[in-house]
Regions:
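Solvent-exposed loop/turn and edge beta-strand elements of beta-rich ligand-binding domains
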Residues: 1-187
Length: 187
């Protein structure tokens, strides 16, 4: 089935004659196909568009959600804007505050994916996620930086190597400040 690795083992099944009145013979066989899974990795940088070198961003946090488990996807309120599959822009204004994070499985037990926090090199890697489409949201934004838009990760292959790097740029906040100096006597 889709989303599973192919078990190439050849299994021997014995079917014996059970009489002329038996129209159907059933044999049970367990096949050990595994769900495809793969991690993804990212790196966070910060630049203002003026510099040639970028700063690595430590302490940025990301939460991972399985798209098919999101409330508005399940109840049909949110549909893919392109009519086929969800894109990052579909989740730009989505409220994730009441949603459950995605799960991965350890020995058959569902384990919530923890918040991914970038290290001092701006690097974070997810656990191996089961086959499916996920939306990743920046949940912790370091001080004085802008939060990046959500992005979509599609797990389609079975690999122990994380998906290639995704580089995200947290630009510093820019603002204008106007100072008006007033004289105490003239106002």
């Amino acid at each position: 089935p889709e989303g599973y690795t192919l078990d190439t083992t050849k299994y021997e099944v014995s079917v014996t004659y059970e009489g002329q009145d038996v129209t159907e013979v059933t044999r049970d066989l367990t096949v050990k196909e595994q769900v495809k899974k793969q991690a993804f990795q990212l790196i966070k940088v910060s630049e203002d568009g003026e510099q040639t070198e970028t700063d690595l961003v430590a302490g940025a946090g990301f939460k991972v959600y399985l798209i098919s488990d999101l409330t508005q996807v399940k109840n049909g309120k949110l549909k893919p804007s392109n009519g086929e599959s969800y894109t990052a822009s579909d989740f730009k204004n989505y409220d994730f505050s009441k949603e459950q994070v995605a799960v991965t499985y350890e020995n058959g037990t569902a384990v919530p994916v923890p918040e991914l926090i970038t290290d001092t090199k701006g690097y974070a890697v997810s656990p191996e996620l089961p086959y499916g489409s996920y939306v990743v949201v920046e949940s912790t934004t370091p001080e004085n930086l802008k939060t990046i838009d959500p992005f979509v990760v599609n797990v389609e292959n079975d690999s122990r190597e994380p998906m290639q790097w995704r580089v995200f740029d947290d630009r510093p906040f820019e603002f204008l400040l106007k100072i008006v100096k007033k004289d105490a006597q003239t106002g």
